[in-house]
Amino acid sequence: DDTLSGFRLARLEVFNWGTFDSRVWTLQLDGKNGLLTGDIGSGKSTLVDAITTLLVPANRIAYNKAAGADSKERTLRSYVLGHYKSERNEVTGAAKPVSLRDPNSYSVILGVFHNAGYDQTVTLAQVFWMKDTQGQPARFFLGAERGLSIASDFAHFGSDIAQLRKKLRGLGAELHDSFPPYAAWFRRRFGIE
C-alpha cells in the first residue's frame, strides 16, 4: 500500500522531560495522525518540543513556539531539570525557577519511526544529563535501525552515563556526540536529501 510508504512517527516516549517526571510517558501514534489537546500548561508544547529536539539542530530551535511564548521562557536546561514555576526571593526580589529534578538525574526523549511500505523501523533518541550546576545539559544522540524503548533499553545501568552508552552500543545503536553526524545518519535512513 503506497499510502503507508515513508517514515511516520509510530511512538514518542519521554522520561524526565519538562513536567513529564519520574516515569516513561508514551504517545502511541502508530503512524497515524494525532491530536494534542488539553488545558494551558498541560504539556502539549512540551511534547512538540521533544519531537523538534529529535529532528532539528539546537541552534535552530525556539522552544514553546507552539504556545507563542517568549524565546527565553523554556530552554533545554528547563526541560531536563523540570522547571515548573518560579519563586521570588523576598529579599532580593529575583525570581528563581523551581525544578522537579536535581542535577543528578537524566532525561531521555525517543521517537520510533516506521515505514510500513518497506517494513523499516528507525529509533532516534537523545539522552541528557547535567555535568555541572550551571549551563546547558550534556547529551548524546542515538540512531538504531530497530525499535527501542526507554523502559527496556535506557534503564538498569546505574548512574554512569558511560555504562548506558556501552549498553546501547551492545544493542547495535549508533551513538553520536554532536548533531551533524546524527542528522546525517537519520537523513540517510529517511531518504532525506
Where are the regions a protein language model picked out?
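Extreme N-terminal "head/tail" segments of very large remodeling/mechanoenzyme assemblies
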Residues: 1-193
